[in-house]
C-alpha cells in the first residue's frame, strides 16, 4: 500500500490531547493531527523520530498529520483511522487471502444488525462480514489490542457473534502496523470487556486473523508480509 501525501522528517515533542501533538519540523514547532485515539505511550516519547504528512489545504486546523514513529530501529504506522482499512481492502481486491477468493463482491462500510462493519463479502448466497482493527502496541514481540478502552470495539464483537450465531460467516482482522510481532493477544490489562467479548466471539465461530505489516518510510509503503496467530488464552 502506498503511503499517500508528502512525508517530512520531524521530531516528536509532546501530545497535547487525543487528536493533536506538538512536533518539530526543521527546527520549528508545529501542531500535527494524530490519526489514532489510542494512548501510544510507548511510541510517542519526547524526542522520538517521526514522519509527518504535510497538508496543502489551508482550511485544516493543523498543517501536518503524524503518520509514522521510529521505535527500536523500525518504523511504526500510527494511522489507525485509515491505514488498516486501506491495506485490508487492497489485499482483498488483489486476492491475497485464499479463504476470501471465492467471494465475487466486496462492499465497504456495511450495516448489519446495529453496527457498521468495515467489509462485507458476498457470493451466491454466501455472506462474510469483517471488522478491521489496527494494532500499534507490541511488547516482547506480542501485539496487544486495544491500547485504550473501546466500547465501540466491544460492541462490534458482540454483533459479529450474533451474525455468526445466525449462520453467516464473520471475522476480525488485526492489522499489525509494524513488523516486530509474532502473535496478537487481547489486552486484558486495558480492556477486560473487549478481551472477554473476543473470546466469546471465537467460541461462537468468529474467525480471528492477524497480519503483520512492514513499513518502509523511504519507499513510502506499508505492506502485509505475513499472517500470525491470535492467542486468546
Swiss-Prot record:
Superkingdom as given in the UniProt entry: Bacteria
Regions that span the bilayer: none
Pfam families, alphabetized: SfsA, SfsA_N
Family: Belongs to the SfsA family.
HAMAP family assigned: SfsA
Listed NCBIfam families: sfsA
Protein name (database record): Sugar fermentation stimulation protein homolog
Lineage: Bacteria, Bacillati, Bacillota, Clostridia, Eubacteriales
